[in-house]
Amino acid sequence: MEKMRGKRIRPRDSGELVEDGRSESERKTRKKENDVVSKGRIGRGRGRGEVSKRSIEIDISNPEKDIKPDGSRKCLGSTCHHCKILTSESDLIFCSKCNKKCYCFDCIKRSYSERTHEEVRAACPFCMMTCICRACLRLPLVIKPPSEKDTDVKLKQLQYLLVKVLPVLKDIYTEQNRELEIESTIRGHPVTEANIKRCKLDPSERIYCDLCRTSIANFHRSCPNKNCSVDICLSCCKELSEGFHQERDGKKNAEGKGYECRIPAGQGKDSDAYVPLHFSTWKLNSDSSIPCPPKECGGCGTSTLELRRLWKRDWVEKLITNAEKCTLNFRPTDVDIVHECSSCSTNSDSIRRQAAFRKNAHDNFLYSPNAVDLAEDDIAHFQFHWMKAEPVIVRNVLEKTSGLSWEPMVMWRACREMDPKRKGTEEETTKVKALDCLDWCEVEINLHQFFEGYLEGRMHKNGWPEMLKLKDWPPSDLFEKRLPRHNAEFIAALPFFDYTDPKSGILNLATRFPEGSLKPDLGPKTYIAYGFHEELNRGDSVTKLHCDISDAVNVLTHTAKVEIPPVKYQNIKVHQKKYAEAMLQKQQYSGQVKEASELENKSMKEVDESKKDLKDKAANEEQSNNSSRPSGSGEAEKVIISKEDNPTQPAVSTSVESIQEQKLDAPKETDGNTNERSKAVHGGAVWDIFRREDVPKLIQFLKRHEHEFRHFNNEPLESVIHPIHDQTMFLSDSQKKQLKEEFDIEPWTFEQHLGEAVFIPAGCPHQVRNRQSCIKVALDFVAPESVEECLRLTQEFRRLPKDHSSSEDKLELKKIALYAASSAIREVKGLMQSSRRSDT
């Protein structure tokens, strides 16, 4: 999706092509590109091997030797479908299914090594839809539509959706009625929606609040001046009328109490420069109307903002009335979400996985079915856990697909073939941007080097593992266009299709935007990154702690285990020990920044004396505050870490010895019944997902210890706006243990294996660490069970500073709820009418 600039957005023409700058002669004489596939002896994930170009020499100097005794001409050979090279028939395997395609031994060995010659002869890769030759990668892949649902089942699902969406519709209606009352006071007479001027937008346009960047769904206040186009959402209007903005600004938004509102200055709406808006100069008029912001803040400063609507009058009220009528006789299934799932406890060995060790808890085990065994009625089982906002892990989802290769270079070649801006350059010169997890800085690297490191590993000059994450490749809004076959393969792998189908999922609210309207970018999106089997505690390949505004499903499609030679491994251990010692020294002074800065100007003797005093002081405070810590006081405590201090307290375990014991030993197999989850092996990535109800305590812990986290250039965090939404913190194993000791909360922790789909509920903070090089593909969706949580998160995100990476309302939840209700009501009415006709 095009980056938003200003307040109203029009998408680029989807068919627009950009000239690549080459002349016609250059296009005709472009050198044929090599058919390259990455080395596959290490990678896992549907396709391995490398393709090499072969040529076959055919002697045509003596044409008579090609004539058979009976006078017929010998067949010189056939063309391999994959490499398109003329090959002797003795080196080819012909498909007995289609009787058309054939593959040479070399291509089978290098590109389809997971299949035997007999399997290829029975059904070739082309027939199996797994061929990765250039021609096949360009072919459009038709996705088989899901079977038509039973009318009664579909009706109940739509009614279920309406029941879940109704509370959001009522919130929108209440908010609009409140603004109508204010407008009545301003005008001095009763005002209805018929009296409110309608602002019509093109279906491909969006309108955003100029204060909080929230998408405007219907009612808003707008400047009537033709030369000014300031728009403000109802939430900001409410806060302005209550004096909220005059009291709150600056860093107070880090605590969720307000935000420093910013609007464009200088060049007007299209300016990238934002200045703080001081509300002391922007006050309500005496009649409670809101004046347009002053010129220095992007407005005209002369007009009064007028109430506007985007839709037909009384549309929201009619939606509520119709939704209530459609669900009048609907009775949702009674679900006991307080106790443990009876289905999981009955089939404990096959469909659940232990992910936490909380005492007296019913949610330590996660629902983890096998995709191959899923039946249609399992959707109710999924709903039970989704209502409780519990993650779900579905195993073996790739078994439902055709088996198309997810090798990184196969994906790259497919992406290149579909690129309209393709210039014909060789892959060795193709540059991409990646993030170095050591300092979180952007680096430029060519694709071959990146993917070689993906398979074989990369090291910094000092021997420390280099962990890179490919940044936005292919672009998230182009995944379906650039990788159509991989997109179809991913969609086919998704379980619980009613929720996850991005086009027509009946319980995916995000699918119900009107045709031609500008839809939010919900993926699919690829995440390609290196990994290391142990936690390094420095420069790990991680996705830092964050919270998604919508539900999401993440599928691990490919892994590659990098083998580290013993000599290099020992070198890593040496560097780990040195780093742990250095960190230990720094942490001994990090309890109070003020005291530490004063110590910097003292002599070494004074430093040593002060160091001892600080240790004693911290030890006394720790002993006296042990009982009060779980209460979650907002004051930061002095935490001094040392191997000699308080050895019986396991909350702090960052000494050199403990780090060596926990992180440097080779991982061992675990049966999952002991609290050694970080030592489990063979998984591609380790997930930590926190419960929604634990978020307040988690935030308190992060604020208390924010000085212990590092981000850019591996330096301590300079400022924290929001400890979760900033996405700058990652909890190590020792910090998770400390969190458990101080606040008695722990995440669900589990490993994601190849072919597993992880479902993450909206509002659950989570973090991920790669244990191997991984390719993951993720998709966002909006489930009926999560719609109220999504709305709450929207309100939380809008309080962030305007230049914050999470402040933009990318989901447009209110629009989604309105469109979903409108669409579902139409379908329910149609089904009910059809049912009446059939009865008569």
UniProtKB/Swiss-Prot annotation:
Zn(2+) 2 binds at C95, C98, C124, C127. Its cofactor is Fe(2+). Induction: Negatively regulated by RPN1A via proteasome-mediated protein degradation in non-drought conditions. Accumulates in response to drought. Induced by the virulent bacterial pathogen Pseudomonas syringae pv. tomato DC3000 (Pst DC3000). A zinc finger (RING-type) spans 80-127. GO terms for cellular component: cytoplasm; nucleus. Residues 502-798 form the JmjC domain. It is found in: Nucleus; Cytoplasm. Residues 621-631, 647-659 have a biased composition (Polar residues). It is an enzyme of class 1 (oxidoreductase). Fe cation binds at H546, D548, H766. Residues 1-52, 594-678 are annotated as: Disordered. Residues 11-38, 595-620, 635-646, 660-678 have a biased composition (Basic and acidic residues). Disruption phenotype: Higher accumulation of histone H3 methylation H3K9me1 and H3K9me2 marks, including hypermethylation of histones (H3) at CO and FLC promoters during flowering and at PR1 and WRKY25 promoters upon pathogenic interaction. Early flowering probably due to misregulation of CO and FLC. Higher water loss leading to an increased sensitivity to drought and associated with reduced abscisic acid- (ABA), hydrogen peroxide- (H(2)O(2)) and calcium- (Ca(2+)) induced stomatal closure. Impaired resistance to the virulent bacterial pathogen Pseudomonas syringae pv. It comes from the Eukaryota. Its main location: nucleus. It catalyses: N(6),N(6)-dimethyl-L-lysyl(9)-[histone H3] + 2-oxoglutarate + O2 = N(6)-methyl-L-lysyl(9)-[histone H3] + formaldehyde + succinate + CO2; N(6)-methyl-L-lysyl(9)-[histone H3] + 2-oxoglutarate + O2 = L-lysyl(9)-[histone H3] + formaldehyde + succinate + CO2; N(6),N(6)-dimethyl-L-lysyl(9)-[histone H3] + 2 2-oxoglutarate + 2 O2 = L-lysyl(9)-[histone H3] + 2 formaldehyde + 2 succinate + 2 CO2. Its EC number is 1.14.11.65. Binds 1 Fe(2+) ion per subunit. Histone demethylase that demethylates 'Lys-9' (H3K9me) of histone H3 with a specific activity for H3K9me1 and H3K9me2. No activity on H3K4, H3K27, H3K36, H3R2 and H4R3 methyl marks, but weak activity on H3K9me3. Involved in regulation of gene expression. Regulates flowering time by repressing the major flowering regulator CONSTANS (CO) and promoting FLOWERING LOCUS C (FLC). Exhibits a positive impact on abscisic acid- (ABA), hydrogen peroxide- (H(2)O(2)) and calcium- (Ca(2+)) induced stomatal closure. This is Lysine-specific demethylase JMJ27.
